[in-house]
A protein has these predicted regions:
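Sec-dependent N-terminal signal peptides
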Residues: 4-15
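Extracytoplasmic metal-acquisition and chelation regions
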Residues: 17-293
Length: 293
């Protein structure tokens, strides 16, 4: 009887134990929460308030990685400047690249902007392609499916729960996408300038034309010569919108706005990056609200 009682305790502990999931960025946490629900405990490594390329590798992140059963990253080199040293020091074999607990969501994305050559002369380029694919709401679908698949592998006991949560989430997301896509139709063929090539996936999805960038090259601060050239291009092309992210300096965009009459629109790069974008739906909705109204 004692052995049976102990076995019941162990079995109950296993059923109630949560999967510790570490994610590199908030949008991944928002998706994982929808799939994992009460069976996962999620910790976010990077803040939406800062440049995703440069997360400060604080010691507190080591303990989070050390305890993780699963690590979900954006991939495509976005975490290359800060995550590898932390992974090495965390010494957690469960979440190393190639293991079941390591999830690189870029692997299920049709990448764009792949450079034909990799050189510092071209700025801060990503060999695998543009890593900012989360700006396209349609990319949420394959990412959610991958996360669910990996959760099933890490925690097979709750396999049916994850599958059910995924189905419910996708049904809701398809409804959201239908409405969102309809709103975006009025923005087709709009011409914009962006600070960084942050919104390319979003722009490509909805037929919006990026005429240029405030950065002369990725990761390179704008020069006076490049800024004047961009102003002239915007006047020639009739560009009336400048897309500004929350973490780059805004002085240059405001200067260009005064010279061209274009309005500066600050769009979030991640869930929670600006006020009122704490959910996946609100994160994307603000794109349509700011651009197409």
């Amino acid at each position: 009887m004692k052995k049976i009682f102990l076995l019941l305790i162990v079995a109950t502990s296993v059923l109630l134990a949560k999967v510790n999931v570490a994610v590199s960025y908030p949008y991944l946490a928002a998706i994982a929460k929808q799939i994992g629900k009460e069976y996962v405990h999620i910790t976010v490594l990077g803040s939406a308030k800062y440049d995703p390329h440069f997360v400060v590798p604080k010691p507190s992140l080591l303990s989070r990685l050390n305890k993780a059963d699963m690590l979900i990253i954006n991939g495509s080199g976005l975490e290359i400047g800060w995550l590898p040293p932390l992974l090495k020091r965390a010494n957690n074999g469960k979440i190393n690249p190639g293991r079941v607990g390591f999830v690189d969501v870029s692997q299920v994305i049709d990448m764009i902007d792949k450079p034909t050559a990799v050189s510092r002369a071209f700025g801060d380029v990503h060999p695998e392609g543009n890593p900012h694919f989360n700006t396209d709401p349609h990319n949420i679908i394959p990412i959610a499916m991958l996360i669910e698949h990996k959760l099933e592998m890490v925690d097979p006991i709750h396999k049916t729960n994850y599958a059910r949560n995924l189905k419910k989430f996708l049904n809701q997301w398809y409804i959201f996408l239908k409405k969102f896509d309809e709103k975006m139709k009025s923005c087709k063929d709009m011409k914009v300038v962006q600070y960084h090539e942050l919104y390319n996936y979003f722009l490509k999805r909805y037929g919006i034309v990026s005429v240029g960038t405030i950065e002369p090259l990725p990761g390179i601060a704008p020069s006076s010569k490049h800024t004047i050239k961009l102003i002239n291009t915007m006047k020639d092309e009739g560009v009336k919108v400048i897309l500004q992210d929350p973490y780059h300096e805004k002085k240059t965009a405001n200067f260009i706005s005064k010279k061209t009459g274009a309005r500066v629109i600050v769009l979030p790069h991640d869930v929670g990056a600006i006020k009122g974008t704490d959910t996946l739906e609100s994160f994307y909705s603000i794109y349509a609200e700011q651009l197409c109204n």
